[in-house]
Amino acid sequence: MMKSILAALDGSAESLAGLEQAVAWAERLDADLRALFVQDERHFVTYPTYTDSEGTVPKPIPLSGKAKERAEAEAAREESELYSAYERAIKGRAVRGEFRVVRGLVEHTLVREAHAADLVVLGKRGRGLDESVEGAGPTTETMIHEALRPVLVVPKGGVTSGPMLVPFDGSHGVQRVIVPAVELASALDVSMTVLTLAERRSDGEALQAPLRAYLKSHGITGDFRVVEGHDTERGAARLILGAAQELHAGLIAMGAFSVGPLREFFVGSVTREVLTHAPCPVLMMT
């Protein structure tokens, strides 16, 4: 059962939307909430632009003087703003939580902290990224691939209530994400639509059969759909996104890659396309 939720914060609108979702899930699951702001240690050093006589770049140099004061003041301001956002998010909610600040390499620190959590919640993209790029940020992609935990990716202003959509191809990632997906669906008491792409309907139904039994044993109402035919990666992503729009889905649960016997349905490009345009949070595991 999910008893520990890690919410990664960086001040972006997406991370604050993720915090709201993390608080809601912590309350519904009666789980502990750990809100974490990682101060990027790279903001407190300067990088030499030269190489030494052997052609190697010297180690970064810690900031000093006014530059250090400005960096520390900015970090303190961000910490204060995020703590205020955290307090607002938990106000009046039955949540056991803590707000922590650590300094380190962001991705490395979050991956390490994720090992003490049952669920990681973070925004689709972090602060400071080029607004013209719609896709998930590098920290989000790193967490999906390396956290070894289910990762809930939250867009800014997305739909957060409604049935759950599970694009199912039998791959390792989607098989692993089914367990936390079922727990979340049970907590929300929502139905689950399982969508499979197969060359023949019989292949898709055979692939779905064990999942039918699994959902039934957990009391989850499942709507099983098979789409026949061949499809491109972009077409597969459109299929998922179209189903999410049709269902007014509140969550998509999927694996990040496909290793199944049918044609590849969920690969890196499909993952990115869904994360970029999903109208709701996406729960992922590799």
Question: What label would you give each PLM region?
Answer:
Residues 82, 86, 139, 143, ...:
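A general structural detector for well-ordered alpha-helical segments in enzyme core domains, enriched
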Residues 15, 19-21, 26-28, 99, ...:
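Gly/Ser-rich helix-loop-strand patches that form or flank binding pockets
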Residues 8-10, 73-74, 97, 127-128, ...:
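Short, contiguous strand/loop micro-motifs
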Residues 35, 98-101, 153, 194, ...:
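A structural preference for short, hydrophobic beta-strand core positions in alpha/beta folds
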Residues 14, 40-43, 51, 67-120, ...:
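Structural beta-alpha unit
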Residues 1-65, 93, 146, 159-229, ...:
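Small/aliphatic-rich secondary-structure junction motif
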Residues 128-129, 199-204, 229-234, 260:
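Short, small-residue-enriched loops and turns at beta-alpha junctions
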